Amino acid sequence: MSAETLAARPSPLSRRGRLLLGLLLAAAAAWATLGLAPSDALPGEAGRGILRLFLEGALSPALTYEGSDVPADAPPLLARVAGALWRTVVFAVAGLSLSLVIGVVLGFLGARSWWEDDERECAVRARARAPVRRVLAAVHLSVRVTIALMRSVHELLWAVLLLAALGLTSFSAVIAIAIPYGGTLAKVFSEMLDECPRDTVRSLRAIGARGVSVFAWGLLPRAMGDMSAYAFYRFECAVRSSAILGFFGYPTIGYYLRLSAENVHYREVWTYLYALLALVGLLELWSSRLRRRVVMR
Amino acid sequence: MSERLRRLHRARPRSRFVRASAAVGGLCTAYVWCSGAVEAGDFLSARRRENLVRFLTEDSVPFPLRGEGFDLAGAWSWAGEVLGGRGLQAAVATVAIATVAIALAGVLSGCLAPLAAATVATERPVEPAAGGGRPAWRALRLIVRAGMIVMRSIPEYVLAFLLLAVLGPNHAWPAVLALALHNGAILGRLGAEAVENLEPGPLRSLRGLGASRRSILAAGVFPLALGNYLLYFFYRFETCVREATVLGMLGVVSLGFYIQDARAKLYYDEMLLLIGLGSVIVLAADWVSSRARRYLRSGV
């Protein structure tokens, strides 16, 4: 970088400074809007009692039911925890596998490199005539809009919608995860495809490859590592989402956690929390080992 | 030629672990879909279809448009009333919750990140041999990292639910604190990585000049790591807005509160309208955060 370009640019510190100042002002305004009182952030008399109970529960998570009003046919607590954990994973696996299909299809169709035909890209639009190109551009735009809309509604809100439309069925939980996750995967996949190095693409084009084959052999293998690492990371998120779907009546871990908390059985709450933490921790370990092997640096 | 290709193919990098992971993933997926654990067929049953048709053709249609009295002006004023009244108020509250939460998360992660970074939290910071350190330093890093793992593994929704029982429902703190703790832990981890990946040269020269740990942090680590950190920060802001919307369903007054309210009253038309409003807010936050990131990178 030469001296002129350095002088022509404003210093990066001032840019950050402006952003931070804006952020501070926004936070102050938001604080005032919400009317937050710092004293309310600490528990009151009753809250302290609950907090004490809750923290005591952390040291001695329940291994059997805490209450005495357990129905005779209820499974042992640990079996119930294992079942809830298993169903949490089942919903997450089903939701993520569906969203992977959506993510790959929409991610390809949403990637600029799938459509455009300037020098660096592999073109599907390249050989089409002008009116066809306009139609294809419209398809590209509508795919991107669809991705944004799928992503912009939280999985819990999709669940609420699907509960109203379909009622309580495990398939509605799966779709509630699959739609927003499909959108997120599609967005990230298309960005990864557009941003991955173009060297292979260039050499393939130089030896005469065109169109989809450049995409499939030049671009996809370069982005594949990042894409699979990200997909696995999303699985971890899907497990968390699946867990909280239980708050809406699905039989995942959130359902039992909520029941126990509402009955003030905090030792049982901790059993569920520890189970969820162990599962997520295990997945995180797995995901980081996988990332080290598949992500190209 | 083909012999050479075959040899290259055989010599490609492979990993047993990756293959085993893919196999486990594939088997689990096949099992989940084939075993009947997910009732995909039930989706097509007559009762569900009926429910779906009723939802689409009656429940979700704005009520002034239902049946005989097709009243477009009425629908318009109904939408204006819902969106302009509680909709607007809840939208402002949602964004405000997310903003306060992300600011607190920023402060929290600023405290945690240096404590978790192996290059700083050690008795001889930023020196070439840094990284190990006495057991006390190692224990400190381990505790901070473990705490962050726990905080980011518990979903915000569960955190807010538990905080609601402790703090009471009459203010926004349960939602704000849940988001701040969860995101503070995530940003703390990312910040610690940003600190560890810093170019060691400038920091070592500060150390060579005799700077203390605190001055190295203030004059070297924070300014240098801030750029990368802020990129993550604005990315998390978007997620915060998304989550702030739904935390309302627990009883804090954000958009989710009114969505839950409409749902409980079976006003599905109003519920859809509010969900649409939530979608607009999230898209707006997405736009703001991507603009902020672009501004950081290139100044536009």
Residue ranges and their predicted role:
Chain B
Residues 80, 84, 88, 92, ...:
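Alpha-helical membrane-protein architecture signal
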Residues 114, 161-165, 232, 244-248, ...:
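Transmembrane alpha-helix boundary and packing residues in multipass membrane permease domains
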Residues 128-180:
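Generic hydrophobic transmembrane alpha-helix motif, especially the helices
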Residues 162-165, 169-221, 227-236, 287-290:
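Membrane-cytosol interface at the C-terminal ends of specific transmembrane alpha-helices
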